[in-house]
């Protein structure tokens, strides 16, 4: 999982990326390509 300050650029890297809020953190998850997983930090 990548930890990035800004997720906006990562969101457009794959069409299946989803922006999700969990426990006050913002995540990008991707069911088809797991390598695009990221967290804002």
Swiss-Prot record:
Ribonucleoprotein is among the record's keywords: yes
Cross-referenced NCBIfam families: PRK00831.1, rpmJ_bact
Pfam family, one: Ribosomal_L36
GO terms, molecular function: structural constituent of ribosome
Family statement drawn from the similarity comment of this UniProt entry: Belongs to the bacterial ribosomal protein bL36 family.
Protein name per the record: Large ribosomal subunit protein bL36
Gene Ontology terms: cellular component: ribonucleoprotein complex; ribosome
Record-linked InterPro entries: Ribosomal_bL36, Ribosomal_bL36_sp, Ribosomal_L36_bact
SS bond list: none
Encoding gene per record: rpmJ
Gene Ontology biological process terms from the UniProt entry: translation
The keyword Lyase appears for this protein: no
Organism of derivation: Azorhizobium caulinodans (strain ATCC 43989 / DSM 5975 / JCM 20966 / LMG 6465 / NBRC 14845 / NCIMB 13405 / ORS 571)
Keywords, in A-Z order: Ribonucleoprotein, Ribosomal protein
């Amino acid at each position: 999982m990548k930890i990035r300050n800004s997720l906006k650029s990562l969101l457009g890297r794959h069409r299946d990326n989803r922006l999700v809020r969990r426990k006050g953190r913002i995540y990008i998850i991707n069911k088809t390509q797991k390598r695009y997983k990221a967290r804002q930090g």
